[in-house]
Every structure is written in C-alpha cells, then in structure tokens.
C-alpha cells in the first residue's frame, strides 16, 4: 500500500488548484493527484470536449487569478472554447510542476477510513494497489457522476451514450448518424442539439414535462452590447438576487427589505426575462414554445430547471431553422434495432441516443454509513436530528428574504430534499463536515461540490480557505453554529432555485457574496476595486484577486510574529514544511 500525506481526487479546476495551493503553503508535502480520465481538465478533459462546446463565461472571467488564459478560439461574444480551456489546464499542470504528482487513468472504487493505528483514509483503486493518505481532498466536482437512465431493451442495436462521451463519438456521428435522439433538458442537451443541428442531423429531443420547466437560457449579450456574464459579475446585478450570504448594507435593506425596493427587484427580473424571451423568440414555433422558462413571467429568476447562457451567438437561428422535433414525454423502451418507444404512444427511428440527463453526486465511493457521517447523505436519524435546525433555517430565510416567500409551486415531492439522492451536502461553507471539524478532524475537504458558473475563482478561494484550515492555521465556529449555517444555506437555495436548490448547492447569480464570505473568513478584504463606482458597476474578474495568496501569507506571518515574538517566517504544521514567503 502506497502512503501519501495528501491525495487529491480529481484533476479539474478544483483539484488542480487545491493541489497547487497546498504545495505553495506546504511545499514538502508528499501529495498525489488521481483522476480516472486520460487527460487533465475534468469536464474539460480532451475526451469530453468537441468543436462547438464553449464555457458559459466570457474570457477574462474564466481563468485563475494569477495565470492568464490565452485568447485562442474565442467566440464572437467572448466565450471560451472547450479546446482552449483544456489546453489552459494542461499548461497550468505543467507550469506549476504538478505533472510528477499526477496519476491519470486511476479510478477510485472505494474510500474508507484508514487503520485505527494510522488514521487517515484508504482509497481502493481499480486495477491498482490501495492508497493510504493522512488527508483527503475530494475534488470530483458536481459533474463527474453521469445519470444514465435505463429502459427495457429488446434487440436495440444503436449506441446509447451520455453527453459526457459526446466528444468520443464525433467521428461516428459525422459518418453514421442521420437522426439522433437527445434525452433531457439540462444545459448539455442544448449544447448537444446545437452541435447535431450544425452537423445537419435530424434531432428528436425528448424531455419530460413538469411545472419546473426547461432550462432557462439567457441571450449571450445584453441587447447586443454587453456580455451577459459580465453583467452578472457586477455587485449591482448581484444585489438584485435575494441571497442569504448578503443580508446587510443599503442595497440589501432597500431591494430586499423595502416594499418599493422589492418592486424594483421584480421589475428588474421581469425585464431580464423579457429580454431572454425576445432573444429566443419562443413564440415562433410550437417546438420553441416548449423550451420557454417557467413561470413565464420570471422564469429566468427562479431557474428551477437550471440557468445558463446561449454561448453560440446563432443558437436560436440554428434551432429555428433546424430539423428538430421536441417530444414532451419520456422514453418507455428501446426495441427493434433502432426504435425509441415513447410513453405518449409514439415511436421514433434513431441512429444514436444521447443522454443529457445531468449528473448525480459522485459519492458512491463512500459506504452508506460513511456518507451519512460526512453529511453527504441523510438517513432517518440525521433527518430527525436536523429537523429543528431546518425549521429554524426556513424561518430565518423567510424573515431576511421576504421576496422568496412567494415561490411558485413545484411538481417535485415536497420531501425530496430529505432523500439521499436529492439533498444538498450539509457542509459548513460547502467544504467542511461540521461534526468532524468540531472534533478536530481536519483530514477531509470537499471543494467543487457546488453549482457556480464562475468556476476558476471559486476553486481558488475554496482551495485557500480549505488548505489553510487543513494545515491548522484557522479555527472554525462551534459545531452548532456550523450546522446552522449549513441548514440555513440549504433552506435558502431550496427557496431561491427551487428544484435545482433541492438537489444541489446552487447559486448561479450569487457567486460574489460567496466569494466575499470566504474572503472575510480568511481575513482578506473582499472589496477589490479602486472606487465606489467600479465596485458596483464594473465586472469582477479573477485578476482582481491575483494577490490573495500573498495577502494571506502576510496575515499569517503577522499573526505568528504577534504570538511568538520571534519574527520567524516559517513553521512546521501538521507534519509539513510550511512556506510563509
């Protein structure tokens, strides 16, 4: 059994940044990164990208703060291609000397507690020897475990794949597919449909109907003038979203606590919804009308079916002129070589079936008992223990954010949030298990298990927050306070994002308050602009945070000097050499 100080599971945005940050602060650490793909990048690995795949964030917002992304293969509206992102993360791995610590094609089959005398964690590896580590950073992210429905099959011979593997099947699609069946209504379904239509294929798009509605898709620009991602990344825009992480200050008191302000908030979101609908022109065809966000008046606010941006400037033009039919039903069975049978009684011939059904939480590597201990799954005992906290959290959200009291009714089971497969993690700051942290156990961290479009910056802040805690440099609040924070966040995201919030730590519009929260925890100044005007109306981008690691080192150094009076610049913490320079 090989032994390491740290094992990072996942070589995407979050895993690579966690590894780099740990080695920056504790360079003598014996650290290993494992990933089951053959290349780095996670969802942006080489095998998962294809030509028409673009990130939903514009170029200057989709990079690490200290490592600029090249302006290669950028869309007319400024969005970054999958190829550029993959090359960027590959270069980052090389330039930060992570390649010698990287082990690809390594699938973790099971995670369990280490031997009682050694502690830590044991990772059972498929077709390899187990790994023992003192600490584990589980950075598989929110898009690593594909949901693949199963249906009765009789002599069905055509490929059935997940959108995860669309890049691997490009040659087959180009040469052998005339008609494709796309299943689901997540953002990946829009990407797959666009790609297929651009390839000249006929598409049958199958999506179940429901009150939550389809994915809410923004226009790529605001009236053709301003990239919509740039607008969302301003404090001005962020202040219009009722957020439990932003409950103080003039804008909060006016826009969320004042009747006139809430009216303006409502006008803002209805205007955003109108611009989105006008750009898409849902009324042009019955097919398009089926994609209209719900509720019709402000569907882009609630985002119950998910929220994203049409990164291809001609998405709706391609859709409206494409050979496509939307079926508001579900698949019943597959049969007769190439036939898809629908629950509404219709049958379709197809050359391929593509699941765009999203991703589940990648926690099956943990045994059920361990999932419960780590706040990844709820059982009847934990539900009972948390019921009072949940009730208190619901009351707090209703009191602080009255705008959310009138959420539209959903078709989802009201108790779905208490199902293991549905509930968000019960983690403090979406990173730490409260019960373990209260016991002084700093051996496991869960970065990346959130849904926020501004991935690189979130990865950077989560890494610094988490690594500094794992090294023992910061103390956390009492267990009761951490559990209440987790319960309150989960109550808020359920009310704010409805179906999405019942399943995930979802905060697409609210990344700035989350970054602010982590910055304050670290003792760093969250306000990075040079004037009040820029602070509120100029987009926040990763480069605004380019010095946070040095700033935190300075804070740590001053703290040590005050406590020790030695003027030292280094210390030993948790067995690792620590770099304070």
Swiss-Prot record:
Knockout mutant characteristics: Impairs the production of depudecin and accumulates an epoxide-containing metabolite of slightly higher retention factor than native depudecin.
Enzyme Commission number: 1.-.-.-
Superkingdom assignment: Eukaryota
Enzyme's top EC category: oxidoreductase
Pathway field: Polyketide biosynthesis
Induction: Expression is positively regulated by the depudecin biosynthesis cluster-specific transcription activator DEP6.
Record-linked InterPro entries: FAD/NAD-bd_sf, FMO-like
Keywords: FAD, Flavoprotein, Monooxygenase, NADP, Oxidoreductase
Keyword RNA-binding: no
A family per Pfam: Pyr_redox_3
Record: residues binding FAD: 43-46, 108, 470
Protein family according to the UniProt entry: Belongs to the FAD-binding monooxygenase family.
PANTHER family: DIMETHYLANILINE MONOOXYGENASE (PTHR23023)
Name by which UniProt lists this protein: FAD-dependent monooxygenase DEP4
Organism taxonomic ancestry: Eukaryota, Fungi, Dikarya, Ascomycota, Pezizomycotina
